[in-house]
Amino acid sequence: MTIIRKSHPLMKMVNHAFIDLPAPSNISSWWNFGSLLGLCLIIQIASGLFLAMHYTSDTTSAFSSVAHICRDVNYGWLIRYIHANGASLFFICLYLHIGRGIYYGSYMYKETWNIGIVLLFLTMATAFMGYVLPWGQMSFWGATVITNLLSAIPYVGTSLVEWIWGGFSVDKATLTRFFAFHFILPFIIAATAMVHLLFLHETGSNNPLGIPSNSDKIPFHPYYTFKDLLGVIIILSLFLTFVLFFPDLLGDPDNYSQANPLNTPPHIKPEWYFLFAYAILRSIPNKLGGVIALVLSILVLALFPLLHTANQRSMMFRPISQLLFWALVSDLMILTWIGGQPVEPPFIIIGQIASILYFSIILLLLPIAGLIENKILKW
């Protein structure tokens, strides 16, 4: 008799995706982040569901309902902090996952890569709308500033902003619709992640060498299930330490004050995971130009497959590209720091230089480095 996991229609799908999946024998721990992102999504959906049971999306009671969750609901404080810091964990894993893809040339699987970019946009939209829900000062003003950026779109901008707001300012209608979208988007993300996996399993995983691994495959279970499990244990240990000991470290103190349209916070800034894009937005003194740069800072990822000039896929044996890659990582860290600083010298010029460098490395220097390395290696 055939084993049920190989014959049952549903089990067969799971089997082909997670058990008998042929995987390269040499993939490193950098390949753990896909499964960790799945874990993050499950944590966020589960904790979010319990928060939604007690949250009210009304401007008069949203802030109080979050306080009620923390004070009166059994382990409400824990669920709230797991959800808030879970977003940070999600983005840490997401950025490391993208960095791995760039370093090892995984972007050459174009369909998987492009679906990944769609996933990044969806996750960013979800996180932004979630940040508005507690209805603190930074929630309100962050929502006002970021949605207002759409008014830079010629001709339809103002109408578009008022349509999103559901009125002439961020108010009850905005909060209600943001809650609705924040609730539904994670399920859309989960469905899109399935498509991401579908495309990945069409080609099979890349590996650190960037060469075909068809001649040397091993089953996903037990090898990579246990390897992933180690990553899960390490990440969860660090995450719970963070949640239980430093729950407010990454939050903004302004968000503990209720939203007040008559009082603007001294420095309006988003959560840390958006600061690099926020710095790029602020480095251009023109509103429309800033918005275009903001969108391009993420969309530029779609150009990686087109700008790949090297004859080797991975950066593992390409020292010039490696140097540029780590320069890009450092540049993103500088942009993140600048995004959290006030708009005054010397931060303005540092942000502008870092923004130019960000686009230069991706659009110009990495493709040139690839060509130089081809020459050096006489490939």
Swiss-Prot record:
GO biological process assignments: mitochondrial electron transport, ubiquinol to cytochrome c
Membrane topology note: Multi-pass membrane protein
Matches recorded under SUPFAM superfamilies: a domain/subunit of cytochrome bc1 complex (Ubiquinol-cytochrome c reductase), Transmembrane di-heme cytochromes
Lineage: Eukaryota, Metazoa, Chordata, Craniata, Vertebrata
Record-given protein name: Cytochrome b
Binding locations of a ubiquinone: H201
Annotated binding of heme b b566, by residue: H97, H196
Cofactor: record remark: Binds 2 heme b groups non-covalently.
Domain of life: Eukaryota
Family matches, as Gene3D superfamilies: Cytochrome Bc1 Complex, Chain C (1.20.810.10)
Organism of provenance: Chaetodipus artus (Narrow-skulled pocket mouse)
